[in-house]
């Protein structure tokens, strides 16, 4: 079947936003390419997953309304980056070829810490004795390839999750929530303002044999006012700053917090927003992104 393909110019700082918007629009696949046209779907451990001149490519079914797609992308871009012009783009009609299958074939497992692997659901796991998170990227808004997701997964791989309750705020694909449960958490609430993300979280949890009662999902306005042991939030610096008080209310005294989706130059502002409630003691960076960890004041 033919496909509609859109390719947008991007940088490491804005590529994830474009990825998310394309997936929210119903892209069958999203890939990242450098100037040499080599796609990166999952980076080899220790390598840099994005280039300064990155192209984000989305693949859509032939009946996609291109004008509506561009309008959605433009509005989303303006909301995320009000001072930047919408990036240059190219729209193409691709003739019959199984581009989605080609993309799936190149998605590889990636390891975090000593025990945690994120694996495509259609490939054999590298280590059957490890904690293996099976993911279908076609249902995902995060696969572990972006530095912010990788930073959070690395943190999850290092924690003791026994008997812990958790909120994954901005759950997207549910990858962080699922990882926490597989590592031993009792329950993780997945929260997102997009219903498609909630559906993706449910689907990916079921793929990993996790009951909906273990990873319940809800919209932000429906989040129960019940504090948890661990707060995860991989979104963007602006919303994180705006929600500092709310996330503190949802975290138990002496509870842990891990925040990402933050550029290096934004770290101080995020730390300042959370310091009234947390001891923000660790900043870990990957490429131009950081993760900030902390402990709720007792």
Model-derived features: where do they sit?
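S-adenosylmethionine
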Residues: 159, 191-298
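Conserved SAM/SAH cofactor-binding pocket of Class I
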Residues: 139-224
């Amino acid at each position: 079947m033919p496909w509609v393909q859109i390719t947008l110019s991007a940088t490491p700082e804005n590529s994830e936003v474009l990825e998310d918007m394309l997936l929210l629009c119903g892209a069958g696949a999203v890939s990242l390419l450098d100037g040499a046209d080599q796609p990166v779907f999952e980076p080899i451990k220790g390598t840099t997953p994005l280039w300064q001149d990155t192209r984000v490519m989305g693949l859509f079914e032939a009946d996609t309304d291109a004008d509506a797609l561009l309008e959605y992308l433009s509005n989303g871009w303006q909301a995320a980056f009000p001072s930047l012009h919408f990036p240059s783009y190219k729209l193409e009609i691709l003739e019959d070829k199984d581009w989605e299958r080609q993309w799936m074939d190149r998605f590889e497992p990636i390891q975090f810490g000593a025990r945690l692997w994120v694996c495509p659901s259609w490939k054999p796991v590298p280590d059957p004795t490890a904690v293996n998170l099976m993911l279908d990227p076609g249902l995902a808004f995060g696969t572990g390839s972006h530095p912010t997701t990788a930073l959070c997964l690395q943190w999850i791989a290092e924690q003791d999750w026994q008997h812990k309750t958790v909120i994954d705020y901005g759950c997207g694909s549910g990858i962080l929530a699922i990882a926490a449960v597989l590592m031993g958490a009792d329950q993780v609430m997945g929260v997102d303002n997009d219903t498609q993300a909630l559906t993706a979280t449910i689907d990916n949890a079921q793929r990993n044999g996790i009951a909906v009662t273990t990873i319940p999902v809800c919209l932000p306005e429906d989040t129960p006012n019940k504090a948890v042991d661990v707060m995860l939030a991989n979104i963007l610096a602006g919303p994180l700053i705006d929600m500092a008080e709310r996330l503190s209310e949802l975290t138990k005294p002496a509870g842990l917090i891990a925040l990402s989706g933050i550029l290096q130059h934004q770290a101080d502002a995020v730390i300042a927003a959370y310091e009234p409630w947390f001891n923000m003691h660790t900043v870990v960076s990957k490429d131009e992104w950081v993760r900030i960890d902390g402990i709720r004041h007792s």
